Regions:
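Conserved hydrophobic/aromatic packing and binding residues within compact polymer-binding modules
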Residues: 11, 25-26, 36-39, 66
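A detector for short, charged/polar N-terminal pre-domain segments
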Residues: 1-6
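Short basic helix-loop element that most often maps to the first helix and adjoining turn
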Residues: 9-28
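DNA major-groove recognition helix of helix-turn-helix/homeodomain DNA-binding modules
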Residues: 50-65
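Recognition helix of helix-turn-helix/homeodomain-like DNA-binding domains
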Residues: 31-46
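Short, Lys/Arg-enriched C-terminal cap helix and immediately downstream tail that follows
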Residues: 14, 48-49
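Residue cluster at the C-terminal edge of the helix-turn-helix DNA-binding motif
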Residues: 28, 46, 57-58
């Protein structure tokens, strides 16, 4: 599995661990809901570092954790 595929999977797993819906997570992170769903479903395989930083901050993890 490539890191591109793992990003969406990891974002979803960390979000679920926090008990956040996609909508709530999108609002808290400042990332558009549609962008978040595309990341989690691997439509967007390479999100920008800016978006990754926003997601990682709310999830309480590093960007590196999201790409492992």
């Amino acid at each position: 599995m490539t890191s591109e595929i793992k990003i969406g999977k990891n974002v979803k797993e960390y979000r679920n661990k926090l008990g956040l819906s996609q909508e709530d997570f999108a609002k808290k992170s400042g990332v558009k809901y549609t962008t978040l769903t595309k990341i989690e479903s691997n439509v967007i395989k390479k999100p920008s570092v800016f978006i990754m930083a926003k997601l990682a901050k709310i999830l309480g993890v590093s960007i590196e954790d999201l790409i492992k």
